């Protein structure tokens, strides 16, 4: 097999691959054995006609399509491996020369992982991240715990107030006509949370269970759904239920109820310790992010669009999974946020670009500094993951696919590259 590699613009590589005639003949024979039953030839039962007869009757090229697929796939995989080419998309195949007894010649044009030009990456200067947990931080955490332990009580003797939790049915109309995505039943809303369009929640104040309320709002000019942007709308709302949070008193009894401590002061001290540990953890990661951000900013790389689109695909899938855990799906979320799918994807584009650039730069640093990941490190990380899933290590390993192992390896490599950059940075 002969391979010629030519680098084109925009991270495109074109390979011209020449495969020996004998290899192509083997593939044609395989194609005949696979497809012979599909052809009808007078004088022969279906699938019993010799290859030469079928070719004479239907033409020499009758078995070429599958043969080309077989040969090109194998030759392409071998060519990119031997030439250290790292595709990020499927190749476009073009046949240049084909025929009986002749070498098969084809080109494969493919987008490849871009080259990274590192700028300054050792000795970058960043400011130290200070850790400071205040009394206000402790009080805020106490209030959050109190919120979680609040009793939710139905309210019947007064109207809706800010902070109340209401259960409502609603349907929206524009010019007297209902619109798509404007209707829901049993929707639970905290009044004053700003979940809905400006003005919607305020007009619920004073309502009681069983009330029918007409809410008039205007969709923002920059609303995601263009057909609704800037238009006035009427929502017919039925109040099903009104509840209020009753917060517990924050005292020694509260501390006993929610913790292992007997006094509020002891509980506060434990909160301060927990917040300090969390703040130190955040500070460490913030420092790492600052260092990496400087190194990434100093680097140059031209990222192909296909890599960005695939990163966005991955981000959308992850986002949808998180929404599913909350009992939502992406369509419902987009309706609530008032944006369409393409707008949502566009909002992710810059982050996708930055994530890919960060990954590529860290890979380059690891390569330049000869940072490696050992089998032992992969094994240790797999064991940690297994424990997080309450699985035995050996059972977990049995379920690992090659791409799972590569993901674990990449995660360790990036962490080691980040550690290297932080160790070699100037912390001011």
Swiss-Prot record:
Q: Does the keyword Iron-sulfur apply?
A: no
Checking InterPro entries in the record gives: PPIase_dom_sf (IPR046357), PPIase_FKBP_dom (IPR001179), Trig_fac (IPR005215), Trigger_fac_C (IPR008880), Trigger_fac_C_sf (IPR037041), Trigger_fac_ribosome-bd_bac (IPR008881), Trigger_fac_ribosome-bd_sf (IPR036611), Trigger_fact/SurA_dom_sf (IPR027304)
Protein keywords: Cell cycle, Cell division, Chaperone, Cytoplasm, Isomerase, Rotamase
- One GO molecular function term? peptidyl-prolyl cis-trans isomerase activity
Q: Which reaction does it catalyse?
A: [protein]-peptidylproline (omega=180) = [protein]-peptidylproline (omega=0)
**Is Isomerase tagged as a keyword?**
yes
- Record PANTHER family: TRIGGER FACTOR CHAPERONE AND PEPTIDYL-PROLYL CIS/TRANS ISOMERASE (PTHR30560), TRIGGER FACTOR-LIKE PROTEIN TIG, CHLOROPLASTIC (PTHR30560:SF3)
Name used for this protein in its record: Trigger factor
